[in-house]
Each structure stands twice: as C-alpha cells, then as structure tokens.
Amino acid sequence: MPQSQGTGPGVITPDGCAVDFYAMLPDFGEPAIVHEAAGSGAAILELGCGAGRVTHPLIALGHPVVAVDESPEMLAYVRDAETVCARIQDLALGRRFGAVLLASHLINTDDETRRVFLEACRRHVADDGCVIIQQHSPEWFATATDSEVTRDGLILRLRDVTRPAPNLISATAEYVAGDQRWTQTFTTTRLDEAELAAALAAAGLRLDRYLTEDRSWLRAVPVIGSG
C-alpha cells in the first residue's frame, strides 16, 4: 500500500488522510476533466472518493456515481450517490461501468498496489468504457519543492521534499484550516511512459490519450478479450 501516515485532529484514514480537512476541500477542476473523458451521462465508478469533493460536482454534471472508499467516516459526507465501503483491491461489484475513475495519484504507488488497483479498474469497466487516471506529471517529479497554496481560506503546504531514489519523492503535506493543523507524510513513485504502458497492459488496458497538456490525466481503454 502507499507509504503514508497522517497526524492531526479528528479521524485519520489508514492512508493518512484527515477526514475533517478533506471534507472542507473544494474540487480543483477534476470534475470537468472527468466529464469530458467519460462522456455525457456516463455512469462512473469512483475509486477512493474520499469525502465527495469530486463526486458531488460529477453528480451535478449528470453522472450517476458509485462512490467507493475504505473509510466510513469519509463516506458519511457523500450525498446523492451509491456508496460502497471497501478497499479498492477487494472490490468486486459484479457490475461494469462506462467510466472508472482512479484519481488522487493512486497510480503513483508501489508496483503491487498499482497492479491490484488497475486490475480492479479493469474488472469494473465496460468493454466500450474507459478508465480515467490521475498521476503526478513528469514535470512535477522533476521540479517538486517546498511550496504553499491557499484556496478558499485553506492552506496547503508541501514541505520536507526529498528524493530517496531516482523514481521516488518523499514529502510531508501540511494542511491548515483556522487553528487546526494536519500533516500527511507520503512517498510517491514516478512512472515513465514505458512503465505506465506496461502497468496498463498487465491489467488488460491500454493508453487511449492524455487529457491534459502536462500528462497528469490520462484515459485508458480495455483491451477486448482481456477481462
């Protein structure tokens, strides 16, 4: 599983996310990208939905959403969607969807976790559907450094950035809302194009196209007969 841990008030999920802070976060443009890639009205399976910051705008755009997260505390914030409390790798709904969403850089993890996450995507995507994936961009891996962003009164800091190996970045995300403060320490793994293609192929998927100029979002499609 991803190497991460969190601190701060309230519930912290197994992967280090602070439920109270994630419930405050707005979207950062993700729903528009997903909507364009999935197609109007497509049913979406959202893996790792958190507190619904992307779920709710997708529903507003006309998508039926099944929202999956391992944290019941996160799912308690999700409205107007079918919710499933499960780990991604254990998910077996027996249904296929027009689009499966794997956001939040969940693909930038260790090889085994990436494999089981992509296999979950493949067994739930329709043959004529797509898998929409968010990854850390190549540029981010090359340039990531300590930084700070403020959005809607919330402060998001990245600090203690190190590169323990050529393909790894370790850092601490610090989140501040008023007098509350949380941290999430994590390690993330870079994928080059060949590694990405190989990971997709192993799961019965192939790259269709990149969705953003920086290649942080991509659309994959099933290899017919593979799942």
Model-derived regions: residue spans:
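C-terminal lobe and adjacent flexible extensions of AdoMet/dcAdoMet transferase-like proteins
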Residues: 195, 199-227
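Class I SAM-dependent methyltransferase SAM/SAH-binding core
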Residues: 51-90
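Residues lining the SAM
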Residues: 102-104
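Conserved class I S-adenosyl-L-methionine
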Residues: 1-50
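A short acidic, Gly/Pro-enriched loop at the edge of an enzyme's catalytic core
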Residues: 92-100
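SAM-dependent methyltransferase
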Residues: 132-195
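A short glycine-rich, Lys/Arg-flanked "PGG" loop and its adjoining helix->strand segment in the class I
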Residues: 115-127
